[in-house]
Amino acid sequence: MQQIQSYVQEHKDRFIQELVELLKIPSISADSAYKNDVIKTADAIKKSLEDAGCDMVEICETPGYPIVYGEKIIDTNLPTVLVYGHYDVQPPDPLDLWDSPPFEPVIKKTEIHPEGAIFARGSCDDKGQMYMHVKALELMTKTNQLPCNVKFMIEGEEEVGSESLGWFVERNQEKLSNDVILISDTGMIAKDVPSITTGLRGLSYVEVEVTGPNRDLHSGLYGGAVANPINILTKMIASLHDENNHITIPGFYDKVEELSSDERAKMAKAPFSLENYKKSLDINAVYGEEGYTTNERNSIRPTLDVNGIWGGYTGEGAKTVIASKAFAKISMRLVPNQDWEEITELFKKHFESIAPEAVTVKVTPHHGGQGYVTPINNIGYQAASKAYEDTFGKTPIPQRSGGSIPIVSLFEKELKSKTILMGFGLDSDAIHSPNEHFGVWNYLKGIETIPYFYKYFTELSV
């Protein structure tokens, strides 16, 4: 394994430029106007996997966007690692808050990334982290050091709920057979503090619609006599939390497992500066459920947040109307044991029950998924830990993430495999936000670390 670091250093400029070219393609799965760009990105991933050394690569059609599948099988008797990632990205809105165009990547130095960071939509989530695996395979094949079989499954719908992935997995279980699944779509505690994500929150995503009169009304002629859907919607949403920021939906917490005092004590040992956290977000104080720390609120507790709210007139100037309708999109992050479909139904039942008689309410469920916890005593976790130790010089800290990757629980159910989450991004990388970026050092460190996972997983498996 002596050649790994030297290979990365020798080819780092090309590795960076290849990622930059990939980031130029606006593969926004949520907006059908970018359909051709999403498909173009799948084609680019296919070529990259072929160039990296895969023996077979194919673009697999699904009911939605295609999945790119590739494999490098060196010996069927050796362990097989299945790498999952996604090539679609979040919409870049609001564009006016970006310091540079989101699909014109630039590399700039920052306080956290003095070596430079690539600023572009998808740089960290997940094109940059996914592409680390492509380059790691290239490294291992070009230096003849690959110790195991590697398969790739790269999808184009993660940012819209992976709606076609379950369909694909159920129909391709033999093709996707593996001994462990490896994903880099999470983060580290800090640049110099490697960590392995051992838990993910689940997700329930809904849209609500409140309807009052059959048309927009003149606020002078009708104001005070007719229900205003926007006023009512905001009151209904406000009632979903009590004075302690506890969610008020009946039954919402029934299956939430409280962590033991020992587990909470271990979480508290993770390096975390509340002052730096507030400074990075330009906020004066943190906010959340009473009785829990910021790290706990971010990871082991369920949440309910409004992601968007609209209705009435929002254009320039004034228009005195009472809107006929008001809308909101709401996400609920769930913890293991909470079933997302059950929570969605509880939300729907409660939201409809609190609506005043003067309006009608419609709740439309969108996508969702279950939470996930992986044990730290399996060989996949042990291999990842040893890999980080070799490249970072320190043992990684296990941590639970507040984010969701709903397909992880699907993989365990359908493919009977554990998933290892080796992320290299940072909280400050602004995923889903304007000025998303990914540190050049982190990107190259990921390419350097992944081969060691292959090495140790193979050694621990045979």
Where do the protein language model's features map onto the residues?
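Acidic/histidine-rich catalytic neighborhood of metal-dependent amide-processing enzymes
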Residues: 122-199, 461-462
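Acidic, glycine-rich active-site loops and adjacent beta-strand->loop/helix elements
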Residues: 87-89, 153-162, 184-189, 212-214, ...
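N-terminal helical capping/dimerization or prosegment-like subdomains
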Residues: 1-95, 325
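Polar, glycine-rich mid-to-C-terminal structural blocks
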Residues: 213-216, 220-277
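A common structural junction motif
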Residues: 87-88, 240, 244, 349-358
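An extended, acidic, His-containing surface patch that forms the Zn2+-binding/catalytic region
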Residues: 190, 248-325, 337-346, 354, ...
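Flexible glycine/proline-rich, aromatic-decorated loop/lid segments
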Residues: 195-211
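Active-site metal-coordination/substrate-binding segment of hydrolases
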Residues: 78-151, 445
